[in-house]
Curated annotation (Swiss-Prot):
Gene name of this polypeptide: nadD
EC number: 2.7.7.18
Catalytic reaction(s) noted: nicotinate beta-D-ribonucleotide + ATP + H(+) = deamido-NAD(+) + diphosphate
Originating species: Brucella abortus (strain 2308)
Function: Catalyzes the reversible adenylation of nicotinate mononucleotide (NaMN) to nicotinic acid adenine dinucleotide (NaAD).
Entry keyword annotation includes Transferase: yes
Record-linked InterPro entries: Cyt_trans-like, NadD/NMNAT, Rossmann-like_a/b/a_fold
The family this protein is said to belong to: Belongs to the NadD family.
Protein name: Probable nicotinate-nucleotide adenylyltransferase
Taxonomic lineage from the root: Bacteria, Pseudomonadati, Pseudomonadota, Alphaproteobacteria, Hyphomicrobiales
Length: 194
């Protein structure tokens, strides 16, 4: 079985996240995609973070494909970092082929993640195109560090079964929706507290 692991704050989840998930399922030929809602992102301000239960509920609403399984694995495992979560998932599922799925907009800061090289050395990575990222992704530290491990996107269907490090950039339809922009709109609509 091949499973995509798609993690994030999803604060809030939106159609752009669903599009990334659908592209990953289709282009990587995944049996399932685990939509992993994190309780918190160490690189983001947690004061703007909606409760985990709300983000899980909204993610379920956005993720319509039955192959998408919305989870709170980091909370269940009581871990904070993606590298720890992925190690626990792999140990619990030794017969599953996993691929880490991320939007290209996250690639610019991927080198700031705890043990990011370990993630790339232990999991194939599929980077899904996002607006504004198509031309800049090659200059990211991850793309430069692992340039010899890049596969042409025509090999995306076999990426999950490749020995890491292995990664590809998948072009395709893009959504301009952004959680940050959606939160700003919600703040403007909210009644002011005086």
């Amino acid at each position: 079985m091949t499973v995509g692991l798609f993690g994030g704050s999803f604060n809030p989840p939106h159609g752009g996240h669903a599009l990334v998930a659908e592209i990953a399922i289709r282009r990587l030929k995944l049996d399932q995609l685990w939509w992993m809602v994190t309780p918190g992102n160490p690189l983001k301000d947690s004061r703007e973070l909606a409760p985990l239960s709300e983000r899980l509920r909204l993610s379920e609403e956005v993720a319509e494909d039955p192959r998408i399984k919305v989870t709170a694995l980091e909370a269940a495992f009581h871990v904070r970092y993606t590298a720890d979560t992925l190690a626990l998932i792999r140990n619990a599922n030794p017969d599953v082929y996993f691929v880490w799925v991320m939007g290209a907009d996250n690639l610019a800061s991927f080198h700031r993640w705890q043990r990011w090289r370990e993630i790339a050395q232990n999991f194939p990575i599929a980077i899904i195109d996002r607006p504004g990222s198509t031309l800049s992704y090659l200059s990211s530290r991850m793309a430069q560090t692992f340039s010899d491990s890049r596969l042409d996107e025509r090999y995306a269907p076999v990426l999950a079964r490749r020995m890491p490090p292995a990664w590809t950039f998948i072009h395709g339809p893009r959504s301009s929706l952004s959680s940050t922009a959606l939160r700003k709109v919600q703040l403007k609509k909210a009644p002011s507290k005086k």
